[in-house]
UniProtKB/Swiss-Prot annotation:
Enzyme class (EC, first level): ligase
Assigned protein family: Belongs to the pantothenate synthetase family.
Organism of derivation: Thermoanaerobacter pseudethanolicus (strain ATCC 33223 / 39E)
Listed name of the protein: Pantothenate synthetase
Active-site annotation: H37
EC number annotated for this UniProt entry: 6.3.2.1
Keywords tagged on the record: ATP-binding, Cytoplasm, Ligase, Nucleotide-binding, Pantothenate biosynthesis
Further information: The reaction proceeds by a bi uni uni bi ping pong mechanism.
Biological-process GO terms, alphabetical: pantothenate biosynthetic process
Length: 283
């Protein structure tokens, strides 16, 4: 496994691999890897011949009062995990390597970034699309794998790829959960034992939504109401939003015809957690 913090090295390595006919897979991460991230690496391995992982806590996607400085980091541990998974290349740049001078060019996807998480985290998705566009230019991957847990992020990146003709296929990977149902997240480390228990209310509320859907309920408001009810039954849970949208366009649904995404964001104590249920689409 090659580890580098230099863009020029990545370019040379990828060029060499492409010349030998290899298909390049990319998994962009912010590090502090968990089983969810590792599942993305495994999916990338299935769809490509050479798997690269980027580890970069991207400052431009964090708001002024968010957790950039506090965000967990452990490169040594991450590298051990990636080596075990058979990853080929790890790119772990410094902020100076990614943004050597004042950043005057950004990539911004309109409309679909203004709702769900985007409504509460202004500028977040502009930071995400800008860094992902940079990574796509650095790696020129054939495929890139993103987790469904960040459903809005997947939709936004897919739209950017479509609109700007990036020659990369975006593969969506299913949410990986702890044995008790909590969606895996690097931020789960912030939760104290009481909050960790309370956080199960997110997946429980989505299970209730799934029950309704399986029983034939198609009215989005009925489902949203039920999810809110379950979430509000947990005293430590403060709901930020519950939405029922189309998974690709993120347009609000009133009636569920085929595909739907039930997306939620909550604060458990001071920790913001997201989760979702994808209905009518197999990934």
């Amino acid at each position: 496994m090659i580890v580098t913090d230099k863009i020029s090295n990545v370019r040379n390595i990828i060029k060499e691999q492409k010349l030998s006919g290899k298909k390049i897979g990319l998994v962009p991460t912010m590090g502090y890897l968990h089983e969810g991230h590792l599942s993305l690496v495994r999916i990338a391995k299935k769809h490509s011949d050479f798997v690269a992982v980027s580890i970069f806590v991207n400052p431009i996607q964090f708001g002024p009062n968010e957790d950039f400085d506090r965000y967990p980091r452990d490169l040594e541990r991450d590298l051990k995990l990636l080596e075990k998974e058979g990853c080929d290349l790890v790119f772990a740049p410094s902020v100076e390597e990614m943004y050597p001078s004042e950043l005057l060019t950004t990539v911004n996807v309109d409309k679909i970034t203004e709702k769900l998480c985007g409504a509460f985290r202004p500028g977040h998705f502009k930071g995400v699309t800008t860094v992902v566009a940079k990574l796509f230019n650095i790696f020129t991957p054939d495929i890139a794998v993103f987790g469904q847990k960040d459903a809005q992020q997947v939709a936004v990146i897919k739209k950017m790829v479509e609109d700007l003709n990036f020659p990369v296929e975006i593969i969506k990977a299913p949410i990986v959960r702890e044995s008790d149902g909590l969606a895996m997240s690097s931020r789960n480390v912030y939760l104290n034992p009481e909050e960790r228990k309370a956080a199960l209310i997110l997946s429980k509320s989505l299970k209730e939504a799934e029950k309704l859907l399986l029983n034939g309920e198609r009215n989005a408001n009925t489902i949203i109401k039920k999810v809110n009810e379950v979430l509000n039954s947990e005293p430590l849970c403060k709901v930020q939003y519950v939405s029922c949208v189309h998974p690709d366009t993120l347009e609000d649904l009133t009636y569920i015809k085929d595909k739907a995404l039930i997306a939620i964001a909550c604060f458990i104590g001071t920790t913001r957690l997201i989760d979702n249920l994808l209905w009518g689409e197999n990934i």
